[in-house]
Each structure stands twice: as structure tokens, then as C-alpha cells.
Amino acid sequence: MHSALHKQILTVKRGGRTFKQRYYLADKAPTRSNHVPPSSKADVHYGMLWAKQANEGVAHALQTIDKVHKVPHALERIPIKVVHIFKPGVGGSYFAGTRQQKSYIEIAKGHGTAAGDLAHEYGHFLDNKLFGRSGNFGSWDGLRSNKHELSKLMRALYKSNGARIIVKQYKKDQTNRQYEQLAFGRYLLAPHEMFARAYAQWISNKSSRMRRDVMHYHEVTKRNLYPSQWETDDFAPIAREFDRVFRNRGLR
């Protein structure tokens, strides 16, 4: 009956007499934080051959993300796999999952920017599983509804000078019928891609290594007149919105 209780004796002396009262104290229930480091909810499958640099990049990215914010303990676990991706220029991918298969992230072991790539793909994961509902990405819902928690962040992204440069070039490519360029422009302007690139840049503010990875992609895409990232001053209001969103969730 008292298997989880501990007997205690209270002794009181009064008027030359001694009174003893027996009572029981229950064990303190173990407490579990509602918010945990993101790395504690990730199952990393490191690569084997020729994967040392990518493995280190993934580990560094998770350590950096842990320094920036937490995630709810109830957030589903995400497998992260360091693999060979047979697509030139592709550093990683996020699979949103189905009823039959859970979500996962793949990071290319030969791309050279694994830390930045992991931050980008983890941004997709959070957009989908933390901020999204019913399988949707929160970034899309935030663009559609002013009441969504990502609404102000998404407005800041599309009002930025970086986004305007992409839109301006996209219109030129429409006029000139540059179809391959148009496809890339549409890709960059998709809400979930805007969110993931911005999330990676926000995280990279805590790590010079990650910032090199993120801005390397920026320099490459600038050559095609579609800059993927934001200049420092242009990004400042966006960073503040990320701070606000995660703070409102109690994750910072």
C-alpha cells in the first residue's frame, strides 16, 4: 500500500510528555522539461566512406541549433542520414513523410557545406512539423492567414530587398522566356524555401563555419542573378521575427 511512500516520525514534547505522529512522504515524481535541445530529438546516421567532413558538419550544425533554440519534447524524432546524393549541386533534402513512412533528412556527404545544408533542411522539418498543421507547411499557412504565428515573419521575408531582387529578375526572365531561370526563381520564392533559407541564415549568426556554408550558396546563386540569401542589414528585421516566433513559443 505504501510502496512509493516513505515513513516519517514527527516527535513533539509538550508538558513533560512525548507525542509521536507517524506520517508518509511520497517520492517526488521525476520531472521532464517540456522543451528540449533539438539534437535530443534527432537520430543521426553518420556516413561511412569519405564522409568525415560531412559528419563533422552535421554534428556542428546540431550543436549550433541547440545554442539558438529548443523544441517541444512532443515533437517527433527526425532521422538524419549522411549519404551520397546523385544530384550535382544538391546538398540535402527533406522528406515530409506519409502515413506509411516517417519524415527524414538526407545530407550529401560530398557537397562540402554539410553544416549549412543541415540547418536548411532542419528548417523545412520545423516548418512542417512544428509550425505546420495536418501535413501542411506553416510558411504557406502564414502567407495565407494574418492570424497564423508565422504571418509577420513571412511578410518580412517577402518585403525584404533580397526577395524583391528575385522578383525583379523573375519578371525579366518571363519577358525573355528564360524558362530554366524561371523554374529556379519559382523555387526560391516558394514560401517553404524562403523559410528554410532564412532559418539557416538565422542559425548561422551563431557560427562562422555555418555562415560560410550558407553564404557560399548565396554567392553561387548570385551568379545566376538570383541571390538566395540576404545581406546583413536586409536580414536584421527577419532575424528579429525569428526571435519573436521562437520566444512566443517559449523556445528561446
What is the predicted function of each stretch?
Residues 4-13, 19-252:
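Active-site-flanking segments in enzyme catalytic domains
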